[in-house]
C-alpha cells in the first residue's frame, strides 16, 4: 500500500481509481494527474516505479486535499453563518441551501421526521 497525503491507497487498484480514495481528488483530477505525469491510468499502483510514486506524491501535495480541504470548507460555512447571510441561516437551521423545495423531498438534509403528538 502506498501512502500519499496521509492516506493508504489500495495497491491492487488502477492508479486513477486509487487516487480517488484521497478526499478532494475525483475522477477528473486523478486522470489529469496521471496524464501530466505520463502514467498510464490503467496500470496498478503496486506496479508503479518508486520514481513515479514520488512524482505522484509531489503532484498531490500541490493540491488542497484531505484535512486542509475539510478545514477550508468548514471555515467557508462558518464565515457564511457569522455574516448572517441567507445561506448561513440555512446552514444553521440544517435546511437545503441552494433553493431546493422543502415542503417535500428535503428528508436527507432535514433528518428523520419528528412525530407530532396525537390529540
Swiss-Prot record:
Name of protein: Small ribosomal subunit protein uS13
Cysteines joined through disulfide linkages: none
Subunit record text: Part of the 30S ribosomal subunit. Forms a loose heterodimer with protein S19. Forms two bridges to the 50S subunit in the 70S ribosome.
Organism: Nitrosomonas europaea (strain ATCC 19718 / CIP 103999 / KCTC 2705 / NBRC 14298)
GO terms of molecular function: rRNA binding; structural constituent of ribosome; tRNA binding
Cleavable signal peptide: none
Gene name as annotated: rpsM
Function recorded in the entry: Located at the top of the head of the 30S subunit, it contacts several helices of the 16S rRNA. In the 70S ribosome it contacts the 23S rRNA (bridge B1a) and protein L5 of the 50S subunit (bridge B1b), connecting the 2 subunits; these bridges are implicated in subunit movement. Contacts the tRNAs in the A and P-sites.
Region (Disordered): 94-119
Keywords: Ribonucleoprotein, Ribosomal protein, RNA-binding, rRNA-binding, tRNA-binding
GO BP: translation
Gene3D superfamilies: 1.10.8.50, 30s ribosomal protein s13, domain 2
